[in-house]
Amino acid sequence: MKLLTSVPGSCVFVSVVLSSAVSAADFSAVPSGKYLVDPTHAYINMQYNHLGLSNPILGFDEFKISMDLDSASPTNTKVNVEIVTDSIDTGSDIFNEHITGEKWFDTAKNPAITFTSSEVAANSDGTFNVTGDLTVKEVTKPVMLVVTINNAMIHPSKKSPVVGISAVGGIKRSDWGLGANAPFVGDEVKLEIQAEMFIAE
């Protein structure tokens, strides 16, 4: 299971933050084009409150992230995420079986979770608001994503354009048919995404 540290902030599920050591809007070092996630440097984790006793972190081990970057006009950029639902890893085989069952993600009938962006707006602090459609268990609802850039550069060893991203966002799981045991198990779910994305060759 690929885990990150716990997610700060309030309710978060799918909000993508692309965070920057330099200017968040500075793509001058990389060209426009399609960028694909490096699976060896990428994480998608979610967190929720359990009875007020703990804040478990669950992760997905298989997913694709693509970004059609317009480096000259970043607000024209498009982002797509596809998660293999059955790749969820709770750290427990027993809990994995439970959460992939019909009561929760029902992965036999719902093999993928998807997010497709529809609009990107720049913020004064250098982040971006990304609005798009999140589909979970055949339910599609709009979600706003907050986006920043960690770095955009030519990778020092691979000599290829790369963009580093961090992501946070939030939903109420009950809005997507995942409301079992609420409010004892928190309805608000947090997500953190970290990913390095290389230009497609």
Task: Describe the predicted segments one by one.
Residues S23-E201:
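Low-complexity, acidic/polar, glycine-enriched regions of mature
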